[in-house]
């Protein structure tokens, strides 16, 4: 199989599994119901977006992803949010995990967030970037490491 076809199969299988196994996340109590595939999507996002950041920075990426799941403007599953077109740049290429220790850290932190061990350190952010360019209609909630986090202006 070509790498593009393999990637498409991966995305479709993760999305289908997510749809079948995960209910929409409307509040923090439902975050605890994430399936193994949802945790994997959350861990991959944290790894690829923040592997060079501190735990605090990686936690902020995890919380931003979960905040999107809770917001009705985004897909209702973690995998749906992570693989939504043009949202997480790394998904376009689906790179392999190369630093196993960093991935293990991302997975541990994702599981800890799901278990309720870490409060949202982004103040409800739905967006982040490393360019310090504020998306229109948003306000910066916090800067952690090389990322700035934003939420919509109400």
Predicted regions, residues:
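Bacterial N-terminal signal peptides
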Residues: 8-15
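Positively charged n-region of N-terminal signal peptides that target proteins for export
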Residues: 1-6
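N-terminal signal peptide c-region/cleavage motif recognized by signal peptidases
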Residues: 17-19
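Bacterial extracytoplasmic/cell-wall-associated proteins, especially those involved in peptidoglycan
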Residues: 23-154
């Amino acid at each position: 199989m070509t790498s593009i076809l393999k990637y498409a199969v991966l995305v479709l299988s993760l999305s289908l599994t997510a749809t079948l196994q995960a209910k929409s996340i409307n509040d923090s109590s439902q975050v605890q119901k994430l399936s193994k595939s949802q945790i994997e999507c959350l861990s991959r996002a944290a790894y690829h977006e923040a592997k060079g950041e501190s735990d605090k920075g990686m936690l902020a990426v995890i919380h931003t992803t979960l905040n999107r799941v809770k917001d009705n403007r985004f897909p209702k599953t973690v995998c749906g949010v992570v693989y939504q077109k043009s949202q997480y740049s790394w998904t376009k290429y689906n790179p392999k995990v190369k630093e196993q220790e960093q991935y293990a850290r991302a997975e541990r932190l994702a599981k800890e967030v799901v278990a309720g061990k870490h409060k949202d350190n982004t103040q409800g952010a739905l967006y982040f970037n490393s360019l310090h360019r504020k998306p229109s209609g948003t306000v910066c909630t916090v800067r952690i490491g090389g990322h700035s986090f934003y939420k919509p202006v109400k």
